[in-house]
Every structure is written in structure tokens, then in C-alpha cells.
Amino acid sequence: MCIRDRVGMACLKAGIHVLIEKPIAANEQEARELIAAAEQAGRLLQVGHIERFNPAFRELLNVVANEEVMILEGRRHSPHADRANDVSVVLDLMIHDIDLVLELAGAPVVGFAAAGGRSAEGPIDYVTATLNFANGVAASLTASKMSHRKVRCLSAHCRDSLVEADFLDRNLRIHRRAHESYSATRGELLYRHDGFIEEVSITPTEPLYAELEHFLQCVRGAAKPAVDGLQASRALRLADLIEQAVEQPHQSLQQLNTPL
């Protein structure tokens, strides 16, 4: 175990509730050990998938609850930096969107495909992945540490709308088609109403503050963890499968024998 996970394990065994940074652990075995320790101690284990507390995602979740989601699209790009060069882009960046689409899709993953690579020696630093869910929803995710600008966006393509969340600007836009196509004249000009865009008002909140406040509420028994050990372990498992697929190029869509 890394130092972080060893400290988390020690706290759980000492009877202390734990909020641990994502990913939950370096591998599935260590994740299972942390989950078991929390259960044995009767203590909370919450995992810091902080984008769950981004106000843009929270509003996106509310909006799509009343929509028929068809495709989810996540883009998480960063320019090259000296930090986090010892970890792959999947575990550093993409795992955020893996967690979010698992929550939004609300169904097991039954198949996936992934491709990517590295610009130099070291971990993978650009990846694209496609996920197929049991309910017919599909997700397309891209993550890169080689971009020329920082991007943090998640879109939900729904039957009657396109919902776009920007996690950096913390805004949400809903593109809708007009229910009726109609024409109107003004002088000699002809107008046609094809659709419109809604700018959703979002209450500004700091995700880290909201996450810590939520953890305190969980400790006091007023809420359940937004991301518990099992949910975080599921995201880690899928991230591991994506990494393995990238290391084995030229493979087509892989079906999972056991839906994830």
C-alpha cells in the first residue's frame, strides 16, 4: 500500500471515519482491504471524487433525471505539466469522468473499447474510451495530458435535448429543439424557429468545501457518502480495464463476462 492508503487503513482500524482521495487505492485488492476494514470497524469510508460536488454536475444530474439519456460524452484535457507524471492519465484525469458517467447511466457496463498511448517514456498520457451500458446508454470519454488548453466538460445527449456542463466555468447549457417548426414574416424577411438554448442558473459553490461539508454530515448520520468504497472500487476496476486495453492495441469492443 502507498502511504496514503496505509494512513487510511490505520485510521479505520483506530475507529476513525475516513475521507480518502481518489482513486480509492492503487489496485482492486487494496481497495477491497480498505472496504473490509471500514465494515469491520463500523466506520465510514468516503472517496474524494470531487467532481460529484461541482455545482455544474449537480445541476446536470437534476436536469437529466427528467430526460432520456442516449449518449454521454466527457472531455478532460490538460496541458503538459511537471506534476502527476508518475501516474497514467486514466487514474489521474479520466477516472473523474468514469465515476460521473457510471452515476449518470445508472446501469452496469457490458462492453468497452479503448485506445491511447504516451508521448515519451512513462505512464499513458492520452486515452479515448467507449463504454456500453446494459440499458443502451453509450459513453465516450477522452483524457489527455498533452492538450494546448485545459478542458473539463461533460455532455448528455438526450432524446429531446443536449445538456452541456463546463466544470471549469461551472455553467450549464441546455440545447432544445422547438416542439413546432413555424415560419413568421417581418417585411420581406422569413424566420424559422428551429431550437433554443437555456442558460441554467447555478448557485456558485466550492466543490472541496461542499465535499468536506457532506463528509461531516455523513459522520453525523445525516447523509450517506456520495461515493462509498464500493462505488469507488467499481470506477477503479473500469479504469484498470481501460489501461489494459490501451496496452493491448488493435482490439475491438470487449464484452464483459460479468457486467461491471
Specify the residue positions occupied by each region the protein language model found:
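Short helix/strand-capping hinge loops at secondary-structure junctions
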Residues: 15-17, 22-23
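C-terminal helix-rich "cap/oligomerization" subdomain common to oxidoreductases
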Residues: 134, 214-260
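A contiguous active-site-proximal alpha/beta segment in oxidoreductase catalytic domains
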Residues: 25-84
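Short, small-residue-biased leader/transition segments that mark boundaries at the very start
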Residues: 1-3
